[in-house]
Amino acid sequence: MLNIAIVEDDPQAAGTLTSYLDRYAQERGTTCNSVIFNDAVDFLTGYKASFDLVFMDIELPGLDGMEAARRLREVDRSVILIFVTNMANFAVKGYEVDALDFIVKPVAYFPFSIKLDRAVKRLESRQERELLVPV
């Protein structure tokens, strides 16, 4: 099961991501548990490292997605971060906060599923390494 946070202020965009996650889970025979946050402050307040993946909009009211990602990295270095934006010029800045990738709005399912496959592979690789480390 994947635990996913969607930090997105546009209800339509958040709904699209949620429906794509449902479709992805059905196609791959897995489960995606997603939680939507309408702004970055709500997401970061009381944050606990319980998410495997975060989809983060860059243009958010109040605290923008780039600054939210910087603050997220202060408390959780390992969560996988994918930016969702209509501003492709921010893609390079995403690497400053160790983002795995970015998705340009409007989001289409095929590129979304490829990026999610990449995130899942990274999670699986991380879990395998954790299993191999002797205690």
Where are these regions (language model features)?
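CheY-like receiver
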Residues: T45, F51-R126
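C-terminal output/effector regions of signal-responsive regulators
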Residues: L132-V135
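Helix N-cap/capping motif at the beta->alpha junctions
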Residues: I36-D42, G65
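Conserved acidic carboxylate
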Residues: E8
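Non-catalytic signal-transmission and effector/linker regions of two-component phosphorelay proteins
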Residues: M1-A5
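A generic structural motif
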Residues: A25-S34, V79
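Charged phosphotransfer/docking patches of two-component systems
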Residues: P11-G15, A91
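Charged docking surfaces used in two-component/phosphorelay signaling
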Residues: G15-R23
